Design a protein with these regions (language model features):
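Conserved N-terminal phosphate-binding loop of PLP-dependent enzymes in the Aspartate aminotransferase
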Residues: 1-429
Length: 429
């Protein structure tokens, strides 16, 4: 094998060609992938517990997705929907309108990234309400664009050095029993926000991840989501549910919002929507979504025909392969193994998450007030050395999140958990 094909050589070329601001988890370079496995340019195999940050619920290179993309490529790759539209965009919109929770008629807008979806959700909320304020949550993540960063409740690395950010964005604490933040605490903070920062009649929307992603996989309870829905209705505020990471069966429901039995006014979607192709969506109540004037929404690549074809195939796979049920089974498998590890390792402070959106919080001596970010970083590195791709998250940088493809076999998941145990032993020294 020539030197140019080695990970080390590619790393040197990366450092010479790519900006420093794009971080990299592992210094390996992938040549091919299949379902829940990766192989780098040196032929080393990895079990993928990251799924490209929750993008591959249907796995790498699912045959049905590949076939759909190939068929569309043979027809055409791009026209721009705003110039000469095409059926795939409409067919996918119809399916999402039917899938998103609630009886109210829906409309869908397609874009390319999750951050774009969030930006446009805020635009639509402002257009519908005539208001400008937005309330978000500490620990929330909504993208790296300027409004996305303003809404995001985590500074390092996303917001460092990039301000000032758009105004009239206010943050509430996110409820977490583990961190000692009660739902009553959050509701009291909202009351204080209304009295000290912005009156409710100026708030266009409250945006929430039903399960925080980058923030640490903290789930909002059904009772809290219901109360938030009631408060939004009381004050004429739109409720935006950001399901970019939690959507498309990751939690054991098609959307995590379903656990609360509520209907959001707007939902943002991306990541696993299109099986690895860049596609995002804003889906919401028709009367809300139609507030923007023609020409105010869209984008050159928004709703790419290739990505729409992939997404239509993804929706078929979800149904045919029963991914909600498989997410529940995978989550139970992972949590059972983590509970066994927690009996042996006092660094495991909490195990949580619905379905296969599972997190393990690392602390010192089971003390929630003593997060262990250093151990978390070492664990990710040791896992990578052993052929397991793991992601960390959390405002305190001490949470391991599990995002294996939902199509991964139980045997492969077990193999990955064996590697996790080995890595944890090594990381602890």
């Amino acid at each position: 094998m020539s030197q140019s094909a080695s990970n080390k050589a590619w790393q040197a070329r990366r450092e010479a060609a790519v900006v420093n601001g794009v971080g990299t988890l592992l210094p390996v370079f992938i040549e091919r992938a299949q379902n829940a496995e990766l192989w780098d340019v040196e032929g080393n195999r990895y079990i993928d517990f990251a799924s490209g940050i929750a993008v591959l619920n249907t796995g790498h290179n699912h045959p049905k997705v590949v076939a759909a993309v190939r068929a569309q490529l043979e027809k055409f790759s791009h026209t721009c929907f705003q110039v000469t539209p095409y059926p795939g965009y409409i067919e996918l919109a119809e399916k999402l309108n039917a899938l998103v929770p609630g009886p109210t008629p829906k409309r869908t807008l397609f874009l390319s990234t999750g951050a774009e979806a969030v930006e446009n959700a805020i635009k639509i909320a402002r257009a519908h309400t005539g208001r400008s304020g937005t309330i978000a949550f500490k620990g929330g993540f909504h993208g790296r664009t300027m409004m996305g960063m303003a809404l995001t409740g985590k500074v390092v690395p996303y917001k460092t050095g990039f301000g000032p950010f758009p105004g009239e964005v206010y943050h509430l604490p996110f409820p977490s029993d583990y961190l000692g933040v009660s739902e009553a605490d959050v509701l009291a903070a909202l009351d204080l926000c209304f009295s000290s920062d912005i009156e409710p009649t100026r708030v266009a929307a409250i945006i929430i991840e039903p399960v925080q992603g980058e923030g640490g996989f903290y789930p909002a309870s059904a009772s809290f989501m219901l109360r938030l829905r009631q408060l939004c209705d009381q004050h004429g505020i739109l409720l935006i549910c950001d399901e970019i990471q939690s959507g498309f069966c990751r939690t054991g429901k098609t959307f995590a919002t379903e656990y609360a039995g509520i209907e959001p006014d707007i939902m943002t979607l991306a990541k696993s929507l299109a099986g690895g192709f860049p596609l995002s969506a804003v889906v919401g109540k028709a009367e809300v979504m139609n507030a923007a004037k023609p020409g105010g929404l869209g984008g050159t690549y928004a709703g790419s025909p290739i990505a729409c074809a992939a997404a239509l195939a993804v929706l078929e796979v979800i149904e045919e392969e029963q991914l909600n049920q498989r997410a529940q089974a995978q989550g139970e498998q992972i949590k059972a193994r983590l509970q066994q590890l927690a009996e042996r390792f006092d660094c495991i402070g909490d195990i949580r998450g619905p379905g296969a959106m599972v997190a393990m919080e690392l602390v010192k001596q089971r003390d929630a007030a003593r997060p262990d970010a250093d151990l978390t970083k070492r664990l990710v590195a040791e896992a990578g050395k052993r052929g397991l791709v793991l992601l960390a998250c959390g405002v305190r940088a001490n949470v391991i999140r599990f995002l294996a493809p939902l199509t991964a076999s139980p045997a492969l998941v077990d193999e990955g958990l064996d590697l996790l145990e080995q890595a944890l032993l090594a990381a602890q020294g």
